[in-house]
Amino acid sequence: MKYPFQTLFLICTGERCNAEARGDERGELIRDELKAHNKTLGRKPTVRVCAVSCLDLCDYGPNMVVQPSGIAYSHLNRATARAVYDAETGDGPPRPDLEFEGR
């Protein structure tokens, strides 16, 4: 089966992940930021930004998983999530400093 997108960003908007998040750290705001960035760049047909209710990484949130790389990123805010977007789509340097390091 051929997948319809080249890159998929899954952003946790679950209650536990976002319970202590403030300001630009909330999952919904991160999702909105990346959706707007994606639209501005005209990548909507090949890059998809989605909200998910739980990635089961609540203590490390806000979190995002990117496919097809399979990398999970943690402790994000809007600026760092945008840096991850740019890195994963080839427009910026890799961000290993934001990768989930394990439990």
Which residues fall in each region the model found?
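Phosphate-binding glycine-rich loops and adjacent basic patches that engage nucleotide phosphates
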Residues: 1-2, 41-50, 76, 80
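Short Fe-S-cluster ligation motifs
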Residues: 44-55, 82-103
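Short, low-complexity, polar/charged sequence segments that are solvent-exposed and flexible
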Residues: 28-32, 68-70, 83-85, 92-95
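Local cysteine-cluster metal-coordination motifs and their immediate loop/turn environment
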Residues: 7-23, 50-67
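Short flanking/linker segments adjacent to small metal-binding domains or redox-active Cys/His motifs
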Residues: 56-78, 93-103
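Small-residue-enriched alpha-helical segments and adjacent helix-cap loops
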Residues: 2, 7-44
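Short microdomains enriched in Cys/His and/or Lys/Arg
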Residues: 33-41, 74-90
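Amphipathic alpha-helical interface surfaces
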Residues: 26-30, 34, 50, 54, ...
